């Protein structure tokens, strides 16, 4: 069993097919197929179910994936320990929720100071970003917080005011029972705040419509499709143009914090250390 066998196994498990894994690894398909078969023979157990749509892990394959992911992560960290230079460089894989208003400033400041670092940015919802940080798929992520998890450390980024957004200038709380709610999928911090508020008020929304893109939600509100709850900074341009109206909500639900998270046990590269310093400096400036 060689390291590349584990890399091939992980790629097939992630991609769900030999062809996609071969493309990702720049291998010929026959080589990938042979390596997987050899691995199964060596372990004396099938690791994948083969079907027309591709390949999915068996129960033993899922067990194997846990160990392989840890081994490959340890190998990556070993390389980082010996290859990490004093000058930040390499790739930082960062996740973020869509409405971090301070993100452009943080990224711009970091890039100007450390141009040798390649920043790979991935958007997502808070819950899925936490999962990807825990699974070592991301080096860190900006999420709605704070959170409590034994494997995660967090750094304050900003606190923003949440506003109820409607097309009409006037709003009455009873409208929640007659007007659709436009929200992100489950796992969004803003949605959680809104649902908690409605539950406490004993209100049942007429309909919940889920979206993946912030601009789609805001433009739909502007067209009268429904109402939503987002940070005030995210809707400033539409509010200023008079296309939507912002309404304050009870203080208990009216703000949300953004934090940056990373695994406590992951190796701290100079690139990550300098990124955290940039976040800290920016947070300090905002607090002045």
Swiss-Prot record:
Keywords, sorted A to Z = DNA-binding, Transcription, Transcription regulation
Protein's GO biological process: regulation of DNA-templated transcription
Q: Does the keyword Iron apply?
A: no
Pfam families, alphabetized: HTH_1 (PF00126), LysR_substrate (PF03466)
Tell me the domain of life.
Answer: Bacteria
Q: Where is the HTH lysR-type domain?
A: 1-58
Q: Which family does it belong to?
A: Belongs to the LysR transcriptional regulatory family.
| Name used for this protein in its record | HTH-type transcriptional regulator CzcR
Q: Which gene encodes it?
A: czcR
């Amino acid at each position: 069993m060689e390291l590349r066998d584990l890399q091939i196994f992980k790629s097939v498990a992630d991609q769900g097919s030999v062809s996609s894994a071969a493309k990702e690894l720049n291998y010929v398909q026959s080589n990938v197929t042979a390596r997987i078969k050899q691995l199964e023979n060596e372990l004396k157990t099938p690791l994948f179910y083969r079907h027309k749509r591709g390949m999915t892990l068996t129960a033993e394959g899922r067990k194997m994936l846990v160990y392989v992911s840890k081994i490959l992560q340890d190998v990556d960290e070993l390389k980082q320990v010996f290859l990490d230079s004093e000058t930040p460089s390499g790739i930082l894989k960062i996740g973020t929720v869509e409405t971090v208003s301070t993100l452009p400033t943080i990224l711009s400041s970091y890039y100007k100071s450390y141009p040798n670092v390649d920043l790979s940015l991935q958007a997502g919802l808070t819950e899925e970003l936490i999962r990807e940080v825990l699974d070592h798929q991301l080096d860190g992520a900006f999420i709605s917080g704070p959170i409590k998890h034994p494997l995660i450390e967090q750094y304050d980024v900003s606190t923003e005011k949440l506003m109820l957004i409607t097309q009409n200038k006037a709003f009455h709380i009873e409208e929640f029972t007659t007007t659709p709610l436009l929200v992100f999928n489950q796992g969004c911090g803003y949605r959680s705040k809104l649902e908690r508020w409605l539950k406490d008020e004993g209100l049942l929304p007429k309909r919940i419509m889920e979206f993946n893109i912030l601009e789609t939600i805001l433009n739909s509100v502007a067209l009268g499709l429904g109402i939503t709850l987002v940070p005030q900074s995210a809707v400033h341009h539409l509010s200023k143009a008079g296309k939507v109206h912002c309404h304050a909500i009870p203080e208990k639900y009216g703000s949300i914090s953004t934090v940056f998270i990373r695994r406590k046990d992951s190796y701290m590269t100079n690139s990550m250390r300098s990124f955290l310093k940039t976040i800290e400096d920016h947070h300090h400036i905002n607090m002045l």
